[in-house]
């Protein structure tokens, strides 16, 4: 399935729709495994800019130097967000994804210090509460992807840390977007988060018609929640990441 150039725009759009439309989780992850070798080329065909916009948002909001911040990239896929994070100087990067094939692609450039196999919404994130200075979910908050009820799992963010989320506002995702906004509102009303700003952007796919807003959220004070087993602290920069199950 690998190819040197991405598919045509109609082919790539069809592939994205197919991925979102698979209801069975195992089949969906298998689809992503098979798609992984071509994924970067395909989203380049769509002129996909969500990773860059999310990192721009994070860079402007995060206090302190980027190189000292420990970042978690949830649903990291092939590592498009990591590539954008390295440009402004973020070096301590962890990633999780449910697709082994995607993680294999993400591991190859050596940008992540740790990669873990984890499907958010099906299992806890593999880090203890209050670990990360910032957590991002880019491109996975839509119908058929990460469920809204998984958002409280982001308590792996440190109190005072940042969470940066992107979603879409096209007609096929409006129901999910409304549910996501309701979830974020409930968390804010419960005192778990403080909303900083929502960035409406023209398009995340400049070759398509998906019109998402970008979100930033600030965990003000987090109540105790059931934490997943702790992993060891991050490895030294430049070491090969370890893929964990």
Curated annotation (Swiss-Prot):
Gene3D superfamilies associated with the record: Vaccinia Virus protein VP39 (3.40.50.150)
Keywords: Williams-Beuren syndrome
Pfam families: Methyltransf_25
InterPro entries, per database record: Methyltransf_25 (IPR041698), SAM-dependent_MTases_sf (IPR029063)
Keyword DNA repair annotated: no
Disease: METTL27 is located in the Williams-Beuren syndrome (WBS) critical region. WBS results from a hemizygous deletion of several genes on chromosome 7q11.23, thought to arise as a consequence of unequal crossing over between highly homologous low-copy repeat sequences flanking the deleted region. Haploinsufficiency of METTL27 may be the cause of certain cardiovascular and musculo-skeletal abnormalities observed in the disease.
Protein's name according to its UniProt entry: Methyltransferase-like protein 27
């Amino acid at each position: 399935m690998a190819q040197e150039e991405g598919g045509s725009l109609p082919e790539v759009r069809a592939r994205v729709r197919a991925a979102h439309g698979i209801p069975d989780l195992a089949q969906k992850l298998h689809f992503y495994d098979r798609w992984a070798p071509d994924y970067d080329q395909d989203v380049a065909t769509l002129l996909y800019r969500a990773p860059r916009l999310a990192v721009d948002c994070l860079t402007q909001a995060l206090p302190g130097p980027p190189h000292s911040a420990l970042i978690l990239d949830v649903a990291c896929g092939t590592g498009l967000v990591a590539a954008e994070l390295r440009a402004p100087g973020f070096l301590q990067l962890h990633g999780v994804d449910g697709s082994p094939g995607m993680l294999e692609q993400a591991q190859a450039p050596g940008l992540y210090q740790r990669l873990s196999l984890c499907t958010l919404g099906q299992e806890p994130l593999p880090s203890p509460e209050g670990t990360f200075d910032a957590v991002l979910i880019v491109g996975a908050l839509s119908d058929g992807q990460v469920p809204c009820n998984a958002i409280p799992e982001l308590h792996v963010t440190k109190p005072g840390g940042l969470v940066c989320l992107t979603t879409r506002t096209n007609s096929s995702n409006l129901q999910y977007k409304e549910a996501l906004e309701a979830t974020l509102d409930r968390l804010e009303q419960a005192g778990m988060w403080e909303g900083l700003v929502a960035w409406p952007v023209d398009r995340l796919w400049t070759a398509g018609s998906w019109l998402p807003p970008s979100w930033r959220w600030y965990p003000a004070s987090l109540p105790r929640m059931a934490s997943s087993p702790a992993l060891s602290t991050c490895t030294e920069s430049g070491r090969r990441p370890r893929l964990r199950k």
